[in-house]
Amino acid sequence: EFLKMVEAISAADGSSGWVASFGMNPAYLAALPEETLKEVWGDSPDIVFAGGIFPPQPAERVDNGFRIKGRWKFASGCMGASLCGVGILPAEEGALPRMAVLPRDQVKVDPTWDMLGMVATGSHDLVVEDAYVPEAWTFVRGGKPNVDTPFFRYPSLSFAAQVLAVTTLGLAQEALDIVRAMAGGRKSVTGAPNLGEHEYAQIALGKAEAKVRAAR
């Protein structure tokens, strides 16, 4: 049902659909310790999370936590976030990449995003000058969730891939619908056939429709 909603929103506006897709972020955050999850959602379910994962930045382990700094790109929705996550790579040998979660006021948003057609995703850079993040506020991205319900048993990285893919599915379907409407329009003043009466257009539209259906 969530995927269907994201697809419908994306058909109306691609940027809105892209940002709406990140409503699945609780699937990521479920890998935080249980006590941290209570702090995140203990007072309200209306917590907006945005993440800048790449490139992961080196993190020094200190006092049961990490000292972090750096710049992370493509943090969609960060302007309206209450919590921000950034990708870190602990310094110790063999450590897995993690995500560190910080309050929005500890993160600077550098407005670098000005992409034609998708500017409203607000996928700006995140900058952290120097911050301490307790280990309890970090997690391995895609790690085992600490919430045992059907939703959280589904692999979070697989879910993330699906919600992002369905955004483009909504855009593609809307584009097809627009072309179909144009193809059946009025004939030109010269009496030439409209687009939909041309065999090459029918074939191209049919192939495109087949690709969208196969992707769905």
Task: Give short role names for the model-derived ranges.
Residues E1-A81:
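Glycine-rich flavin
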Residues M5, I68-G70, V128, A172, ...:
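Buried hydrophobic positions in well-ordered alpha/beta secondary-structure cores of metabolic enzymes
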Residues I47-A50, M115-V119:
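Short Gly/Pro-enriched turn/cap motifs at secondary-structure boundaries
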Residues P56-P58, K73-S76, L89-P90, W113-M118:
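A generic local secondary-structure boundary/capping motif
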Residues V62-N64, P90-P97, D105-V107, V133-W137, ...:
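Secondary-structure boundary elements
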Residues R71, C78-A81, D110-D114, W137-R141:
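A short secondary-structure junction signal
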Residues R71-V107, G122:
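DPxDG-like acidic metal-binding loop motif
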Residues L116-G117, T121-R213:
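Glycine-rich beta->alpha junctions and the first turn(s) of the following alpha-helix
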